[in-house]
């Protein structure tokens, strides 16, 4: 692999590994990065962005391995983790019901879109996410109090995060805060739901993702996924520790504003 190719793979992995856990769209930022840095067409960049979820999926399975194991055990045998397991199942089903048709429609739109139009769409979606986070009231519920209504609301919202620019973690956090969950609990639950969501996203685009990965080369994809895995582990741990101190909404609004203004400024020059 040439040096420039290695550098771009590392960049894509770092962007995916960081943005997956912030309420800014990992798919949107990864898509934008690959379009602008590598000159990849929008639809191909979108395929690769979804495929990079493999690295973050491995990271969340490692970090949340014990909670997932306890969930499966209690779903089968009964126990305190059974409620969380049912919450995850209902939320994931609702995500699939919304996400699959939205993604199929979106794919055709993005295939015909220009790079600047995609970037501006991403910016607008990021601003919406930021506004949602700013208006969401924070409460005192914890993970032991999740119910079916929470699962349906969060799952349906999560389904729209297949759109580049709509943040999965930002959407789930905002909805959980709106449902009056504590901020730290909202972050934990958002990460907990990430495993099933990423597994579905990776499976959704497996064929197209492999085709796009073949164009980039095996070494490029392995490097990008590996970097994404390592960076994801670090970011998850940091965010779980300082969740109550971060103002995610300002990050979304700032990046969304940049994504909207840069193409407009370029046209004026």
Curated annotation (Swiss-Prot):
EC number assigned by the record: 3.6.1.27
GO molecular function (one): undecaprenyl-diphosphatase activity
InterPro entries named among the record's database cross-references: UppP (IPR003824)
Membrane topology summary: Multi-pass membrane protein
Subcellular location: Cell membrane
Alphabetically ordered keywords of this record: Cell membrane, Hydrolase, Membrane, Transmembrane, Transmembrane helix
Major subcellular site: membrane
Superkingdom assignment: Archaea
Segments crossing the lipid bilayer: 4-24, 50-70, 86-106, 113-133, 146-166, 186-206, 220-240, 246-266
UniProt KW Nucleotidyltransferase keyword: no
Reactions that this protein is recorded to catalyse: di-trans,octa-cis-undecaprenyl diphosphate + H2O = di-trans,octa-cis-undecaprenyl phosphate + phosphate + H(+)
GO cellular component: plasma membrane
Pfam family, one: BacA
Similarity comment: family membership: Belongs to the UppP family.
PANTHER family: UNDECAPRENYL-DIPHOSPHATASE
Function statement: Catalyzes the dephosphorylation of undecaprenyl diphosphate (UPP).
Protein's name according to its UniProt entry: Undecaprenyl-diphosphatase
Record lineage: Archaea, Methanobacteriati, Methanobacteriota, Methanomada group, Methanopyri
Gene (name only): uppP
